[in-house]
Amino acid sequence: MPAIMTMLADHAARQLLDFSQKLDINLLDNVVNCLYHGEGAQQRMAQEVLTHLKEHPDAWTRVDTILEFSQNMNTKYYGLQILENVIKTRWKILPRNQCEGIKKYVVGLIIKTSSDPTCVEKEKVYIGKLNMILVQILKQEWPKHWPTFISDIVGASRTSESLCQNNMVILKLLSEEVFDFSSGQITQVKAKHLKDSMCNEFSQIFQLCQFVMENSQNAPLVHATLETLLRFLNWIPLGYIFETKLISTLIYKFLNVPMFRNVSLKCLTEIAGVSVSQYEEQFETLFTLTMMQLKQMLPLNTNIRLAYSNGKDDEQNFIQNLSLFLCTFLKEHGQLLEKRLNLREALMEALHYMLLVSEVEETEIFKICLEYWNHLAAELYRESPFSTSASPLLSGSQHFDIPPRRQLYLTVLSKVRLLMVSRMAKPEEVLVVENDQGEVVREFMKDTDSINLYKNMRETLVYLTHLDYVDTEIIMTKKLQNQVNGTEWSWKNLNTLCWAIGSISGAMHEEDEKRFLVTVIKDLLGLCEQKRGKDNKAIIASNIMYIVGQYPRFLRAHWKFLKTVVNKLFEFMHETHDGVQDMACDTFIKIAQKCRRHFVQVQVGEVMPFIDEILNNINTIICDLQPQQVHTFYEAVGYMIGAQTDQTVQEHLIEKYMLLPNQVWDSIIQQATKNVDILKDPETVKQLGSILKTNVRACKAVGHPFVIQLGRIYLDMLNVYKCLSENISAAIQANGEMVTKQPLIRSMRTVKRETLKLISGWVSRSNDPQMVAENFVPPLLDAVLIDYQRNVPAAREPEVLSTMAIIVNKLGGHITAEIPQIFDAVFECTLNMINKDFEEYPEHRTNFFLLLQAVNSHCFPAFLAIPPAQFKLVLDSIIWAFKHTMRNVADTGLQILFTLLQNVAQEEAAAQSFYQTYFCDILQHIFSVVTDTSHTAGLTMHASILAYMFNLVEEGKISTPLNPGSPVSNQMFIQDYVANLLKSAFPHLQDAQVKLFVTGLFSLNQDIPAFKEHLRDFLVQIKEFAGEDTSDLFLEERETALRQAQEEKHKLQMSVPGILNPHEIPEEMCD
């Protein structure tokens, strides 16, 4: 069978592509089937045939046959793809009679298929695709070649309800294409013309919608009309909304009909979102009428949370749409309702609904409600941030300090507080969670959705606390009592309460915060003693740790408490339940960062600073921790030591602090001095890696003073580096590159990497560049550069490049003299690893360009000093970078190029020869990425670079002729150069299009956003053949706009003395 199929495919390939014979529709159906249901070689063959056929310039002439005679739906879809392709790219070069023919054919087909209601249901997808084809034709034809389209479609709609229903879909699609998705699909000018045409002819469409809504008994048609209307509401002239019966029709006629209520409510939401001041009365009517209908459909005493969980999809959607309506209306027009006493009751009912909907257990709906509560609380707080004297709720309603708007929302806000406390999302810091099976485990994946929800809830609760902190405290204290007495005890309830308590840190006055926190922590510690079972203890422990980590201000002010908390964390470091140790270390590091000074001072009632106690017992504290937890612990203690300002004391602390790792290090180094083979022992190498990781984390926290420890191990460490490098090279020579995957070799590479990390980490935090350059850099270069150059590519450490980049960034001019040596060792050999493709060695790739960027930014003179051949390589590598498909590399490449151009411009001597050699080349390469669709993400940067380059030409900064031997000015030459470049790349463009594009590159080079849109317009144009008729590109109109931009720019320049060259100033201004 496969053999026959392959023969068939081969034969088919020839036959289907032979346009001199009639199309064999059965054969085409077979090939399409083969594409969807075949496999391997035959599927590939089918793919190839169909692609060739689709790309054939005459393929569209076969579409009618395909649509009429094919029995296979997929073949029909394929036929429509061919048609869509020709409409989008070659329409302008088809003879007019053929365009008319295609148009008539498509319209006829749509009318035929959509006039029959049973057909409409059965062939929904097919009609959908046909509609899209018609809209693509409209974007080319209307209004110029089809001025009567709107009246045609409106007229046809009155002949048949089924046809009318489909026409509504076409109008909806057209609206979306023109108003919602036009950016990057059609040029700005054309989009504007289409929008104007739609607005101008909207009255006919609106009458049709009204006619259907008032007269039709056909439910699917009415639904389609409402859906279409929904798409129109965000752009139609406002008179159609507010000066017709539209609002009352939507509310009275459709809102309470189950089939239409969702789309009607969406329409009302869209209208509610309009912000204009002149239609206040209409907004009031919209609100009161909607609320009246709502109360009938969903009485105020409904338990919406329950109704939602038992509801069908349609009912659940209604509740979601209700939340959107209320949120939109209250945000936009809430203050209007507050001002009218007769609307107060309706406002309170709306808020009541919002509270009920906020209890629904569906995150998406809660997020919508939260957006409103956040808006309201923030607005009330910002109106008078400092009027939170006592508790408004407790002091009775007649409290004169309270701003009147707050008074109005008092009781509602108290309910929102309770809601926030009961539903608080999980913060990022909490690692101990209950999983879906009800087990308490460590969380490994961060849930970004939940983190964002937490941030929004936290912000809202902080505002609510500012508005009335006593009420917040009462709610929280009562809920905590119910945890302790067991009436509300559950992991979930305890979690949400503690997360809420942690989230309002800083929102209370310090005295209130102190009183409140002492109660909270005491109760939680009591709960920890009272509850049995490891899971219970783990949950309570995680909550205690989260809360104490959130209140550094309180801890700083209460030493006894801080000490108790830290000792409790040390206790938790021995608790082996999943996640507890991790969280203890994480909380410890947060507290160490925020309270660092308090650990190095002698506190009242203490005989020594607490740091000494920690260092004396360090062995006991960390004995149950895993290696990575030990590293975190070391970093935390490092922050404390970094806070000691007395250098002698600090040095003594660092020695004591690094005692354990140094003992192990010294013994390994001693053994290695006697017998170097110890450095091939897996356990020893692993130990070295762990010790260095400890040093890396310690150095990160201590900063520059760590030099005393680094100096102690520096030369031994570099010797170990060299020795391990030799071991790795020997292993590769003996056993090939595969050996780099072996555990021992990987451990050796870890030691090398951590060595580089330690050095670069310290350099980036050091504060004496000269000392670093003289004492630390020479032995480092000696150990790593030659080793890097000599190694096989697979064994080169990418960290060598990043370390060099960090050193250059930090030391700047102090290292310029070493750049040639660094470049000799790493530049060419790395370039050869990454210039074969865009994928291999991703880390080397990224770091290589970071190094280039560092040299370019901080040691630019070194670039000018390297030989021309090497400089050309540098430039080639930058061009290679911005052509990358890896986004970070491409971005770095563009960044380097932009900085390079700006640096060159500062160097008068070198600049002109640079321009002469490279300017046109760079332009050409930038245009090649601008017009490559896989690089659209870099468009802003492309625009900035091109604008800068065209500006250099225009302002005469390039004095050397870019085209030696030609008498024309550089500006004229570049205009021709770019025009010819684009004409040869896109021969289908008309001269007028290219000329206008090039003009814009000069006119808009001071206005980056406009320049970027100009590029985007050009990208739209290169996708299609324009033919002779370029009228729908509106070139004259665009030309006028560009001329105005040029004049504006000139005016601006004239207003700043000295910006314009004296020879560019008009005569009358010279006197």
UniProtKB/Swiss-Prot annotation:
Record PTM Phosphoserine, positions in chain: S391, S450, S966, S1031
Protein purpose: Mediates the nuclear export of cellular proteins (cargos) bearing a leucine-rich nuclear export signal (NES) and of RNAs. In the nucleus, in association with RANBP3, binds cooperatively to the NES on its target protein and to the GTPase Ran in its active GTP-bound form. Docking of this complex to the nuclear pore complex (NPC) is mediated through binding to nucleoporins. Upon transit of a nuclear export complex into the cytoplasm, disassembling of the complex and hydrolysis of Ran-GTP to Ran-GDP (induced by RANBP1 and RANGAP1, respectively) cause release of the cargo from the export receptor.
Subunit description: Found in a U snRNA export complex with PHAX/RNUXA, NCBP1/CBP80, NCBP2/CBP20, RAN, XPO1 and m7G-capped RNA. Component of a nuclear export receptor complex composed of KPNB1, RAN, SNUPN and XPO1. Found in a trimeric export complex with SNUPN, RAN and XPO1. Found in a nuclear export complex with RANBP3 and RAN. Found in a 60S ribosomal subunit export complex with NMD3, RAN, XPO1. Interacts with DDX3X, NMD3, NUP42, NUP88, NUP214, RANBP3 and TERT. Interacts with NEMF (via its N-terminus). Interacts with the monomeric form of BIRC5/survivin deacetylated at 'Lys-129'.
Keywords from the UniProt entry: Acetylation, Cytoplasm, mRNA transport, Nucleus, Phosphoprotein, Protein transport, Repeat, RNA-binding, Transport
Superkingdom field: Eukaryota
Transmembrane segments: none
Protein name, per record: Exportin-1
Compartment(s) of residence: Cytoplasm; Nucleus, Nucleoplasm; Nucleus, Cajal body; Nucleus, Nucleolus
Modified residues (Phosphothreonine): T448
Primary location recorded for the protein, binned into one broad class: cytoplasm
Pfam family, one: CRM1_repeat
Chain intervals for the UniProt region annotation (Necessary for interaction with RANBP3): 411-481
Modified residues (Phosphotyrosine): Y454
Source lineage: Eukaryota, Metazoa, Chordata, Craniata, Vertebrata
